[in-house]
Regions:
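Predominantly cytoplasmic-facing regulatory/coupling regions of multi-pass membrane proteins
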Residues: 1-80, 147-263, 302-323
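Transmembrane helix-loop junction
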Residues: 64-65, 87, 106, 137-140, ...
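Membrane-interface alpha-helices at helix entry/exit sites of multi-pass transporters
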Residues: 73-77, 91, 95-96, 106-122, ...
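Short intracellular "coupling" helices and adjacent cytoplasmic loop segments at the cytosolic face
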Residues: 80-98, 207
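Membrane-embedded alpha-helical segments of transport systems
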Residues: 81, 85, 89, 114-137, ...
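Transmembrane alpha-helix interface/packing and boundary motifs in multi-pass membrane proteins
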Residues: 82-90, 255-275
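Re-entrant/interfacial helical elements at transmembrane boundaries that shape
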Residues: 92-106, 266-284
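Helix-coil boundary and interhelical linker segments in multi-pass alpha-helical membrane proteins
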Residues: 141-145, 240-246, 286-291
């Protein structure tokens, strides 16, 4: 069986497993529709699709820094398909990075395509950290301040920052990374597509170009910040759909905590880490459990309905390019 057929089969199996694991959420979501203001749900769909477009704008901005010009529609497809891969294959985002490099070839070398997605994670993490004091100030202005929650978020953010610094230091050790890269490509034959010497050469070419002129990352960073604002707004629409107006700090803190949790949980399982942490933090910030769970279901189920089917279609489209 060819590699393309194997990867496609894995994608279908993964999609089936995700649907199976989330079947109760879809049933509960269906019952929630009775009490939901549908025009807010329509707004969620539109805004969520717009967030994928923002990802495409991010990709275009960083690729232009590398002197590559790729069409926005293709980048939009890359955003949806790499998100599908990240959801189906829990690899802490690495699967999506590898797949994006597949979408961008042959115009963009695989190593730089991989780096494009990695920098998205880096810039998004910096943006999330920037919003932590904003959420704390918003919550402190009302009766939702909770020292334990704040301390937990700050500690988690510090851990992510520490891990990020360690990874950055390791990546700068080019000799060590090249040895690891060669070992992985020899040990695991399915990594053959990223196992060539040119992959590492292209990756470090882009890496040195970025950190040799950090100012080129300003526009990609702005798109990363804009993306987070839109995602938080999408979550806020879920509150409005259930007829409740809340302090934006609650929504922002919920988004931050859920994303921090998914960073640590994403290497093990793509289903559950975000949902459990979002529901938990909303309850900790004073929202009734039933309401917090309903908001989480609306946000995540719509996210899956909007992202997974077209993501699978684009995943299948670009799998055909697999060598």
């Amino acid at each position: 069986m060819k590699l393309r057929q194997v990867v496609l089969a894995l994608g279908i199996i993964g999609l089936f497993i995700v649907i199976l694991l989330n079947r109760h959420q879809f049933v509960t979501f269906w019952h929630l529709l009775i009490n939901i203001k549908l025009y807010y749900l329509i707004a969620v769909v539109i805004v969520q699709l717009f967030s994928y477009y923002l990802n495409a704008l991010y990709y275009r901005s960083i690729l232009r820094a590398f002197k590559y010009e790729i069409g926005l529609m293709r980048l939009f497809e890359g955003a949806m398909s790499s998100n599908f891969v990240n959801y189906i294959f829990p690899t802490a985002g690495m699967g999506g990075a590898v797949f994006l490099s597949q979408v961008l070839k042959p115009e963009v070398p695989r190593g730089q395509g991989f780096l494009t997605q990695i920098m998205r994670y880096v810039l998004s993490s910096i943006a999330v950290a920037m919003f932590i004091p904003v959420s704390i100030l918003l919550l402190a202005a009302t009766d939702h301040s909770d020292a334990t929650v704040f301390e937990g978020v700050i500690v988690a953010a510090f851990l992510i920052l520490t891990v990020g610094i360690i990874i950055y230091k390791l990546v700068r050790n080019e000799k060590l990374v090249r040895r690891l890269h060669n070992w992985l490509s020899l040990k695991f034959h399915f990594l053959k597509s990223i196992g060539s010497k040119s992959f590492a050469d292209d990756f470090y070419s882009g890496f040195h170009e970025i950190f040799g002129n950090v100012r080129t990352m300003f526009v990609p960073y702005v798109w990363s910040v804009t993306y987070i604002v839109v995602e938080v707004f999408t979550m806020y629409l879920a509150f409005l759909a259930l007829g409740r107006v809340v302090n934006p700090g609650i929504v922002l803190m919920g988004y931050i905590v859920a994303n921090i949790s998914s960073v640590f949980g994403g290497a093990i399982i793509s289903v559950g880490a975000f949902e459990v942490s979002l529901t938990g933090i909303l309850v900790a910030l004073g929202q009734p459990f039933a309401f917090a769970l309903s908001v989480t279901l609306i946000y995540r189920v719509l996210n899956m309905i909007i992202g997974l089917p077209p993501g699978f279609i684009y995943y299948r489209k670009y799998i055909k390019k697999t060598a």
